[in-house]
């Protein structure tokens, strides 16, 4: 969602929600055919939710942007059958969802994953910005790269930056609650993981948490 759309949502929330629903529904009809084509192919299905790794070989990117392979509102159920996906990856998506929306999406991921399939996630590390606020660490200007979201009044704006992102962010994570959320969802062998240069975006490594879990 663009910054302008976020501002309009704050002023006219009901109108913007209805507009997004109608537009997304219309745009997603062709996407159902693309999902069906994935199922008909002989290759393993690997989904990149949020499209951060768009173009990564072997992964199908899915999000509400035309740059992705498949245009889809991830707040809605995935049009895929149970136990049909080998791997799911998501980078810097879940902070844009409310806690409830994030829980629903994780449940969808578990539903479509095959037994033994992996769910790998990357999100911003809120603790970095909170540590800056309480004086535990100093962080460089690159941690506030999106200028519309950084007001730079006092130390609290380090927290405001990552928590709200000018209306873009809905929920924040540290490693403890990220691992708890994944484990509580039913994933097993949940653990933190290292940066993966074949998948994760290097320019976001400095502010990111990584975790992975497996469907039983």
Cite the ranges covered by each PLM segment.
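A structural signal for well-ordered alpha-helical scaffolds and beta->alpha junctions
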Residues: 28-32, 46, 174-175, 206
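S-adenosyl-L-methionine-dependent methyltransferase catalytic module, highlighting the catalytic core
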Residues: 101-104, 108, 114, 118-216
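Conserved SAM-binding loop
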Residues: 44-131, 211-216
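Structural motif
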Residues: 38, 79-80, 182
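Membrane-proximal basic amphipathic "stem/tether" segments
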Residues: 1-42
């Amino acid at each position: 969602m663009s910054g302008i759309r976020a501002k309009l949502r704050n002023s006219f929330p009901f109108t913007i929600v209805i507009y997004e629903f109608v537009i997304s529904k219309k745009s997603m009809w062709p996407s159902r055919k693309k999902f069906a084509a994935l199922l008909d192919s002989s290759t393993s299905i690997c989904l990149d939710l949020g499209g951060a790794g768009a173009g990564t070989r072997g992964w199908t990117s899915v999000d509400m942007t035309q740059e992705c392979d498949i245009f889809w509102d991830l707040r809605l159920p995935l049009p895929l059958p149970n136990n049909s996906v080998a791997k799911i990856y998501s980078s810097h998506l879940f902070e844009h969802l409310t806690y409830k929306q994030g829980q629903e999406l994780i449940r969808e991921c578990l539903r479509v994953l095959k037994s033994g399939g992996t769910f790998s996630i990357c999100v911003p590390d809120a603790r970095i910005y909170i540590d800056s606020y309480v004086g535990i660490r100093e962080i460089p200007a690159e941690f506030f790269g999106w200028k519309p979201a950084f007001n730079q009044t006092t130390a609290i704006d380090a927290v405001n930056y990552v928590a709200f992102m000018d209306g873009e962010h809905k929920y924040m994570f540290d490693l403890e609650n990220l691992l708890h959320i994944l484990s509580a969802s039913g994933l097993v062998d949940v653990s933190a993981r290292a940066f993966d240069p074949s998948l994760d975006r290097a320019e976001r490594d400095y502010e990111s948490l990584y975790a992975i879990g497996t469907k039983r």
